[in-house]
Amino acid sequence: IPTRGRMNNQITWDSIGPEAREYAALVCPQEEINWHTKQGRDCINRGEIKGINNVRQFILEHAMEAGHDKIIVLDDDLIFGRRISGDLPNLRKTNQEEMHELWERMEWLLMNHTHVGLSPRQMNDKHFPDTVKYGMRQNAVHAIRPEIIHGLGIRYDTMDLMEDYYVTLKLFQSGHRNAVIVDWTWDQRGASGAAG
């Protein structure tokens, strides 16, 4: 979870569920590490790296160095929802105990896709009754295979803005379609302070 300046308001960290928090880490500047660890949050020190494009590239490279073949990169201000049932497009807020279902599903989809996303809440009803769609834009939630992206020479830091869209489009161009889960959603509650 790339973050900066949101010391007291880690919405995504609080939303991902206890199982995910065992594996998750905030990717933050050196000066924020002590505060977050005192709050029980694991951290990765990104040093002086600034700009979400550069931070995403740092995360990809760090994951490869650590031997992670699959990772999920999340914006730091997300809450999650899911369909109430398979009969209607209506959504409900998720609870902590069920969030592992989403992460396990994303991991499973990564077995056959280089990148997996999650539908935003806005306009989500247009996807009903599908549960997964392919070849869609994705943002805020990025499950990726770092080695494949690196092997293709695709870098987040190539673009100053819209780097997530750039990487998605470059993967499409390279023949790697994505899978986007559409019966679960992300939404941005919003928080004060700098992002990423």
Show the residue positions of the predicted features.
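Active-site-proximal specificity loops/subdomain of glycosyltransferases
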Residues: 19-74, 79-91
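A short acidic (Asp/Glu
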Residues: 10-12, 36-37, 82-86, 126-132, ...
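Short, solvent-exposed loop/turn segments at secondary-structure junctions
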Residues: 6-7, 51, 77-79, 121-124, ...
